[in-house]
UniProtKB/Swiss-Prot annotation:
Transmembrane segments: 48-69, 107-131
Membrane topology, from the record: Multi-pass membrane protein
Disulfide feature: none
GO biological process: potassium ion import across plasma membrane; regulation of monoatomic ion transmembrane transport
UniProt name for this protein: Inward rectifier potassium channel Kirbac3.1
Annotated phenotype, changing residue 129 to D/E/K/R: Promotes open channel conformation
Keyword set, alphabetical order: Ion channel, Ion transport, Membrane, Potassium, Potassium transport, Transmembrane, Transmembrane helix, Transport, Voltage-gated channel
CC annotations in GO: monoatomic ion channel complex; plasma membrane
Phenotype for residue 88 to L: Strongly increased channel conductance due to defective gating
Quaternary structure and partners: Homotetramer.
Native organism: Paramagnetospirillum magnetotacticum
Motif (Selectivity filter): 96-100
SUPFAM superfamilies: E set domains (SSF81296), Voltage-gated potassium channels (SSF81324)
Effect of residue 98 to D: Increased channel conductance
Length: 295
């Protein structure tokens, strides 16, 4: 910091723990939900997605049922004016089930049947493609430690966090980047957020199969050299971890991210060893101790 100026002592974190932005966007033109519907349907949660698909399916069938009723008695063997019979006829038509008891009568009803069959095919194609796209998106399956620690390693203060591979399959050519994000003041007195890439003792692993302790030595080249817990908080410092690699099961690149605030840094702590020896002599990775920190 320069000129003795400091930002306010406390602010909400800029990055959520999953690495996503915690910034509210203002001044944008109001965007309707359907303006970017493909992205929205890919990113909403599964319960919301299933609810939307089910709701759209029921509403569409209900609308066609009302259309059949508006045409009069155009469904053979259906009870006159029965919305239930018209609705289930619509379901059978949209799904091309065709049990044979309920039959459209006349050109108007058959026109509606043709239109509904087309809507059913298009709807099935869209729903199936969305479900396939959601299911086939590769995920890294990487676990990040809930805390970072700053303690001595080989006689030098070191910022450390660790991650673990939750799957049996290996991740090839794994890369980790650790970035410091903090508020700084320019020579003109403007407060801005600056990103500092932190040098790691090892930022790449040819094979990532178990756990990995990521370490940044705090020497005179480090952006956090000489910093204390108080000064890091005053600059609203946050640490963003970015992980990328090629997953052998998916045969695709995967990525993961995690962010830490100053509240999630343990000064003077060290991670508990997660490797143990079983009674038969085999080595094991105990993920139950993954987040444990000793002083």
């Amino acid at each position: 910091m320069t000129g003795g100026m400091k930002p306010p002592a406390r602010k909400p974190r800029i990055l959520n723990s999953d690495g996503s932005s915690n910034i509210t966007r203002l001044g944008l033109e109001k965007r309707g939900w359907l303006d970017d519907h493909y992205h929205d349907l890919l990113t909403v949660s599964w319960p919301v997605f299933i609810t939307l698909i089910t709701g759209l399916y029921l509403v569409t069938n209900a609308l066609f049922a009302l259309a059949y009723l508006a045409c009069g008695d155009v469904i053979e063997n259906a009870r006159p004016g029965s919305f239930t019979d018209a609705f289930f006829f619509s379901v059978q038509t949209m799904a091309t089930i065709g049990y044979g008891k309920l039959i459209p009568i006349g050109p108007l009803a058959n026109t509606l049947v043709t239109l509904e069959a087309l809507c059913g095919m298009l709807g099935l194609a869209v729903a199936a493609s969305l479900i396939y796209a959601r299911f086939t998106r590769p995920t890294a399956g990487v676990l990040f430690s809930s805390r970072m620690v700053i303690s001595d390693f080989e006689g030098k203060p070191t910022l450390m966090m660790r991650l673990a591979n939750l799957r049996i399959e290996q991740i090839i050519e794994a890369d980790v980047h650790l970035v410091l994000v903090r508020s700084e003041i320019s020579q003109e007195g403007m407060v801005f957020r600056r990103f500092h890439d932190l040098t790691l003792t090892r930022s790449r692993s040819p094979i990532f199969s178990l756990s990995w302790t990521v370490m940044h030595p705090i020497d005179h080249h480090s952006p956090i050299y000489g910093e204390t817990d108080e000064t890091l908080r005053n600059s609203h410092s946050e640490f963003l971890v970015l992980f990328t690699g090629h997953h052998e099961a998916f045969a695709q690149n995967v990525h993961a991210r995690h962010a830490y605030s100053c509240d999630e840094i343990i000064w003077g702590g060290h991670f508990v060893d997660v490797f143990t020896t079983l009674p038969d002599g085999r080595r094991a990775l105990d993920l139950g101790k993954f987040h444990e920190i000793a002083q």
